[in-house]
């Protein structure tokens, strides 16, 4: 797929949204769908829960990067934003004839594996307890969400599969690792699932620029961390994502 000229980003006021906006602005026309205005960006102000209010944001858009999500403690927030809101974004994209949606899923969809060895040893940086030749978790393995947020992200992946199959949209689900404001891990678990700022931007841009015939994919996005247990080979083969950074613990 040649680089799209018109990209809509939901959740641009968040950390990843801001990083992606700054990178894309030099080569694309970028629009935000956000509840609050974004300085210097064409912003359609609307709530994702209002399907009647969001369609103007999708006019003339090639690619949607859906980053908006609720991460708090209120279950109703997860249901309204991460389930209903995600459905509304996908449906508005379909109705507008958008070519591709890049859906920000989460590595938390597989974080339940951290309760088991050797993954627990990896996220605790118990290097002597990690067996040689261990196989990473891949996107072919069963999901193991570690909470309601993760479960809603798994729902988004399933819905993306349906929109690819039933409506012909190109849907790429990116299981994003831990992106931190300070861009450095603060504990061994963060070091295992860390995704640097520049690797996060690279992963999203690789999804945007992936071949046009890529109909559906679920991909992990983490940096090249010593404690990494999530597969990166599939992302390398599918979109050419090769992390430039990595974390160790102790740092």
Predicted regions and their residues:
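Conserved Rossmann-fold NAD(P)-dependent oxidoreductase catalytic core, especially the SDR/UDP-sugar
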Residues: 88-146
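NAD(P)H-binding glycine-rich loop region in Rossmannoid oxidoreductase-like domains
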Residues: 45-84, 92
């Amino acid at each position: 797929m040649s680089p799209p000229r018109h990209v809509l980003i939901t959740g641009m006021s968040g950390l990843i949204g801001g990083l992606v906006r700054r990178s894309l602005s030099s080569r694309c026309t970028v629009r935000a769908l956000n509840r609050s205005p974004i300085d210097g960006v064409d912003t359609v102000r609307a709530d994702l829960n209002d399907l009647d209010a969001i369609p103007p944001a999708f006019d003339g858009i090639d690619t949607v990067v859906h980053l908006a999500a609720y991460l708090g403690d209120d279950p109703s927030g997860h249901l309204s934003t991460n389930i209903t809101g995600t459905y509304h974004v996908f449906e508005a994209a379909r109705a507008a004839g958008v070519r591709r949606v890049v859906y920000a899923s989460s590595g938390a969809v597989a974080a339940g594996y951290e309760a088991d060895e050797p993954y627990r040893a990896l996220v605790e940086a118990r290097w002597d307890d990690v067996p040689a030749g261990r196989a990473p978790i891949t996107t072919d393995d069963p999901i193991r969400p570690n909470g309601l947020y993760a479960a809603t992200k798994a729902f988004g992946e399933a819905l993306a599969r349906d929109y690819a199959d039933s409506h012909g949209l190109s849907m790429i689900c990116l299981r994003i690792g831990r992106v931190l404001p300070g861009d450095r891990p603060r504990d061994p678990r963060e070091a295992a699932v860390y995704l640097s700022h520049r690797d996060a931007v690279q992963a999203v841009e690789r999804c945007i620029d992936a071949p046009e015939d890529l109909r559906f994919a679920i991909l992990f996005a983490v940096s090249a961390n010593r404690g990494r247990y999530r597969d990166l080979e599939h992302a390398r083969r599918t979109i050419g994502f090769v992390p430039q950074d990595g974390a160790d613990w102790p740092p």
